[in-house]
Amino acid sequence: MKSLTIAALLAVALTPMAKADTADGAALTAMTWDQIVDQARGGTVNWFMWGGSDSINQYVSGYIGGILMADYGITLNRVGITDTVEAVNIVLGEKQAGVSDSGAVDMIWINGENFRTMRQGDMVWCGYTDALPNNTLINWNNPAIANDFGVPVAGCEVPWSKSQFAFAYDSATLPNPPKSIPDLIAWIKANPGQFTYPAAPDFNGGVFVRHVFYYAAGGAENLLGPFDQAKYDAAASKTWAILNDLEPYLWRKGDTYPTSITALDQLFANKEVSMTFNYDASQFGLAVQNGSFPETVRSYGLTDGTISNTNYTAIPFNSPNKAAALVLQNLLLSGPAQVEKAMPAAWGAAPAIEIARTKPEDQAKFATITQLPSVVSMEDLGKSALPELQADWISAIEQGWIRNVGQ
């Protein structure tokens, strides 16, 4: 339940473990679930995850950490990071140094490019998901679950939540927000200084740029599949032209960009800009609840669609506490934990499991959840959901923005 710094964890990464075989993935997958739980009891799990939301942090450290300690005697160390690549780089450095079973990272909240990097570098533990009792709640036949930004999951990570990009505005001051990318472009020019977006490599800023990229390409369907340089070049030239043309109309005339989604939210809260956005619409509700945003904030998707994805948890190849990480993953998938996560007061995140496969009492609780007025429903968003691109595309777009727009 406590949160440790990265430096502190690295300092103890090579400390011998009380149960050394909890690092042996092959041995664990040969055990029964009860045997895995016995191996995990009294242990520790170091979970590296984005730490920018107090509500998410409380859900993880308080609710999840409390259950782990009460039911299994497992200590959950939530390690807050600003970008998932920080955790990936720790594992990469350990792999290069030959640290094969005493790594500092036991689990990562992850998807997209970072998962691809771990798969390509043989840095993620695979082949264990069938050992999780709650794996039966996952619909692995759903391509949006079985593939992470076009990369097959292949038993190398476990879904945690679903999310879809949404825009937010204050209905008291902006009664009719722009509802499509071309409308947004026109609105920005008609309202100079009232819009901006975080610079790459910020995750949410990158997603906004991809929406413009989809528009420039004539639709997401023209970009699906493996990276295609010719298709990229055609869409990229149009995208950079659009964004550079918009720059003088942005906040501070585009001379500077927010460095993070947190910074953009602060500009919105201070009424310096009229809109913000997030890949997790529940964040708008949490901001209203904690007083950061006014109660008149509302959110929505675009008529031409917004990008959606699934996020996951993954266990590095050299985690010394794999048994405890498995118990944590199984708990995160459970009906009660997914219900609590979906509660607006806790987080409001959409479940990654099939609700119909949960126990009747959990299904009943899901049915009673009412989303906050500031949070657009996943049902409404889902009517115009756009797929994510494969990771090679995302890397190219991010680097292209830095070279052609950001510099």
Give the ranges of each region predicted by the language model.
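Gram-negative bacterial Sec-dependent N-terminal signal peptides
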Residues: 1-20
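Short, polar/charged alpha-helical segment
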Residues: 33-41, 45-75, 167
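Extracytoplasmic/periplasmic substrate-binding proteins
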Residues: 251-318, 365
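Mature extracytoplasmic/periplasmic domains
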Residues: 306, 311-380
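Conserved C-terminal helix/tail region of periplasmic/extracytoplasmic solute-binding proteins
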Residues: 21-33, 266, 372-407
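Extracytoplasmic ligand-binding site segments that recognize negatively charged/polar headgroups
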Residues: 50-63, 79-86, 101-262
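Short, hydrophobic alpha-helical packing/hinge segments within bilobed ligand-binding/sensory domains
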Residues: 87, 115, 264-265, 325, ...
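Short, well-structured alpha-helical segments in soluble
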Residues: 91-100
